[in-house]
Amino acid sequence: MTHVNNGEVMEKEMEPTGERERDRETAAGSGVHHRFLASASERDANSGNALEAAATKTKTGTTITNLEDLAFEACQNWSDLHQDFFITDDELEYEDELSLGSSIGGNIATTTTADAAVEGLITGEHQNEQLLMEVLCGNRVSQMTRAYDDIEAVTRLLEEKEKDLELTVQIGKELLTQNNALEARVADLETDLKASNDDRAQLVHELHKKNELISVLTNDADDGTDTDTPTMSKSITLDLLQRKVNSLLDENKSLKCEATQLAHQTDEVEEHERQLMADISAQLNDANSQYDNLSLELERQREENRLQHEQIVNLTARLAEAEMRLHQLTQDNDEHLSLLHVTKENQNALALELVEFKQRYEEVLALLHSAQDQLKQQRKRSQPQARSSFLGGLGTSGAGMGGSLFPPDSLHCELMESSLYSENSLDSGISGDSQRSADRISRMMMHMPSGGMSSSTMGGSVYAGAGNVPPYKRVFDTVRCAGKSGNYMDSGNVSMTQLGAMSMSSSSGPRMASMAYPAGSYYRGGSNQSLGVKTLSSESLNSQSDDGYPAQPSGVPGAPGAKELEAALKRLTPAEVLARRAMLSYAPAGTYNYDEPMGHGTGNVRNSDLPLGVRTPDSIMSTGSSGMSGSTNHMSASMTHQWRLPEKLQIIKPMEGSQTLHHWSRLATPTLSGLLDERPGVTIRGGRGLDDLGMQIYTLSDVEEDVSDDLPGKQFEAPGCTFTYTNSMVMHPDDGFVNDLSFLSQSQMSSRMASTSTSRQPSCPATPRAGLSRKNSCSTFSVNLGLAGMLNERGIKAVTPSALNTPAGPNFSPTVTPCNSPEGSPPRAQSPEPLFGLLSCGADLIRRKIVGDQHQQQQQKQRSSLSKQQQQKIMLSHLERRALRSLNLIEKVESIGLENIISAQRGLGSGIANRSSSPLSSGSLQSLHTSSNSIVDDIHFDRAQIKGVLHRGLKSPTPATASTSAAAAASGPGISTSSSTSAYNSDDSDDQGLVMKIKPSKSATPTTTGAAQSQPSSATTSNGTASETRLKQMQRQKSRRQLKNGMANQRPDLGTISGAGGGGRVRPDLGKVADSGSSSKLSTKRSEAKPAEEEEATPQTITQAFVGSVSSLLFGRKGGWL
């Protein structure tokens, strides 16, 4: 069996009908009808008709409703055809006999009878089949009728029908294949039959011709044997036919065997083909699955290829950009290298010049010191004459001077006249009327009790003809008239806050000096020296000169009535001072004059027997001016109704541009005040702001919870000063809380009111109000002194960095980025510490709160029972609070070893130590004088002790600290206590505050011990509850600042320095900053004093950031200290 295409099957379906028709025609032509062929042809026709009818019925869909019926009929017809088509041997022999009989004997009638029998058999079979189909159809209809009522049975039947249908389709396909094969075989056999029939006809014809020939031959040869010839021919023909039949039988058998063998081979081939088809289908399925997988992989590879292409394009663009930037940066690097080379060359040249200038500066400074020493000696020699009689000396020497010493039209005469005898100025202003000034001077000279001196002599010798000088020749009057229109115009409120929370402001009107006129010149100076005009420049403020800081006078020898003066001062009350000021402010013009005594008819004889020019501490002219009365029996601190600023400096043309440039240069100069103050619009290159450093700004105008804001002198700024003298006034806590604004004119009042909201308010140092008594507690401070004058007045010794030597070694560089130090190079020279004065001030403030002075101790002893009930609250002034905050910052600096950055030089210590204090600061609690031999070694800070004292609420300090502090407090002006703060421990880095532990020198040990033993036992007691409250408030404020600022990290622009616990991080351009365990020089003495506290301190990031700012101040490009 072979597989054929369905198309070929459909094409060959109609071929058997045509072939059968042709066979019938051929058989009809020959006149022979075979039994097998007739029945087969009829069955073929019937099957063909049945197939055509079935196909027609299937197409129309009228009779057959199921494909199963069609398949059943087709199978039945094809099975019948297959059975009837089989040819047996008997049939073949019968056909041969019929053919042989027809050839020999003609047409035989048996063929007709055989065909009738076959047709009857076929009709009976068809009737049986039709009957069977009717029975099956009836059974099927009955089954379908019963099954329609059961849905499950219908479902099962449908499933069975589906399975039967599939089986029927498969069987139909196989049958169609077999039918096609059989049809092909039938066609071949018919062809063979035709050929055999032709051969047989040809043979019959030949046989007939031969028989005729034989008969002719026989007839011609043997005429007499006519009776025997037919018999012989018959016998010959029979033998031939018999042999032919035998051969055909043998051939038939061989063909059957061959057909059987071919059928077996065909089955084997078909089985092999089925196996091949199964294998091919399996391989095709595998190939399809592999194709799908490869398609997915190919899609994924395409997506990856697309992404890689995009990345390649992006990277190519970036590479091109990077190459361009590399080229640009290479060019910039070359330019920067060339600029760096040039900068290094300039830096080296500038360093050499700086070293040369430093050497010259040292020489000049040495000459200045020698000149100052000589000047001091000269003043001491002339001191007794100034004490005995100030103007009397003038009178005695007046005859010798004649009229040539002071020309009447000279500027010197006008300056002397305005500074000594002005009636309309605060300290040394210009008089309003020259003629009235001359008259007043003559009246004063007449009242002076100098025996041989007269007004005519004084007027003729010293100020001869002063009143006769024409007005147009007087310089001050001309300048006054020229500058009267713009005298009080506001030229910009420029404030610069100096260290210590004292403010300076440039105000309207003439500029006043930032430094007070030396008060000692009125006590010690001679007649010619004290009358001279002294001008202090900015260079003299930076020098270590005693000219601006005169020594404290030991009493007033030669001045009669000193004891009475002291008694009068003790009896003076704040109410009287306020009343006197009010009278002087609002009295009519001419009411109070210098030529009229104060106490005519009133019996007021206080302040009598004082020399002319001697000032009292409570006088309004105590620090900057000298008021003189009309006689030696009366001393007046009053002035006339109107206080006006001096107008001396109007001889200089005002230059606003110069003032602006001076202000800019002052802002650009880095100072430590920049760390504590916020200056809007001004930044330090490489520095960081207060927020980055973890600090907050507290101004003097901030109202804190335990400080009242009703203190006097805080609402208005004092008049600004430039280059000459200083206005000053005494502010005492017991003077009440009334704002005295009488010293301001109307225009100044309006300008001050307008600038109050934008400028910082200077404040006088407020002390705790222990009582209304002012015994031994009066100290005079200037309101608007400069930084140097303020520090000197408070007993603080400070040296400006410009006056100190800077290292000039090979590894020193003055620029902002010095050269790197080579390996093995010696360490750079150390500079003196600029924070020495501030530390001493802070130590004084702590000492005031812990120990207290003798007067407060006496009051606490008297009111010990009352203090237990009332719990008096401790008050800190703004200056003290500012100093404590400054000390906290300084403590962070010294915890990482500030002494290694700017350490004190032994050679310059003597200059700082030999500087004397102001006479105004001798009675204050801050007068801790430094000695020349113990500036570094006599004092250090013991944080452990002070921390314990602060935690105990300032109740009971340790015995050593208490005794030393008590001794220092009781030492007074006569005892010199060593309190230098240039060396202190940095092992403990806590932020609770600084504690000063005084190490008394050997020479001062007996004195301090005796003083400490003389103090009462209750001298160091204080209010514990208030102290603890204050301590907790300070700690809370500190913790809030730390949390808010987040402990700022290191400065990336200034590099990193070694902390207290680390090592190895070195900035080569700033030198090495050693930690607490690596400093050898300073740790030697500390290890002797504190051997148990030599452990490493933890690093602090705030400290590192602060040191970064300090380094920018020290090594900054624009005016750094070093």
Curated annotation (Swiss-Prot):
Domain of life the protein comes from: Eukaryota
The UniProt record lists the keyword Metal-binding: no
Phenotype seen when the gene is deleted: Flies show aberrant synaptic transmission in photoreceptors despite normal phototransduction. Synaptic terminals and axons lack mitochondria, although mitochondria are numerous in neuronal cell bodies. Synaptic vesicles continue to be transported to and concentrated at synapses. In mutant oocytes mitochondria are transported prematurely and excessively.
Gene Ontology molecular function terms on file: myosin binding; protein-macromolecule adaptor activity
Annotated GO biological process: axonal transport of mitochondrion; establishment of mitochondrion localization; mitochondrion distribution; Nebenkern assembly; oocyte dorsal/ventral axis specification; protein targeting; sperm mitochondrion organization; vesicle transport along microtubule
Region (Sufficient for interaction with Khc), start-end ranges: 1-450
Coiled coil start-end: 142-209, 235-382
Alphabetical list of InterPro entries matching this protein: HAP1_N, Intracell_Traff-Reg, TRAK1/2_C
Keyword Cell cycle belongs to the record: no
Stretches with biased composition (Polar residues): 536-546, 812-823, 1023-1032
Domain HAP1 N-terminal: 87-382
Composition bias, Basic and acidic residues: 9-26
Region called Involved in interaction with OGT, residue ranges: 456-756
Compositional bias segments (type: Low complexity): 750-760, 854-871, 956-983, 1007-1022
Residues modified to Phosphoserine: S831, S918
Tissues in which the UniProt entry reports expression: Expressed primarily in axons and synapses.
Keyword entries, A-Z: Coiled coil, Mitochondrion, Phosphoprotein
Location within or outside the cell: Mitochondrion
Biased composition (Basic residues): 1033-1043
Region (Disordered): 1-31, 536-561, 750-775, 805-830, 852-871, 955-1101
GO CC field: axon cytoplasm; cytoplasmic vesicle; mitochondrion
Family statement: Belongs to the milton family.
Subunit composition and interactions: Interacts with Miro. Interacts with OGT. Note=Mitochondrial transport by milt and Khc is independent of Klc.
More details: Was named 'Milton' after the blind British poet.
Protein name: Trafficking kinesin-binding protein milt
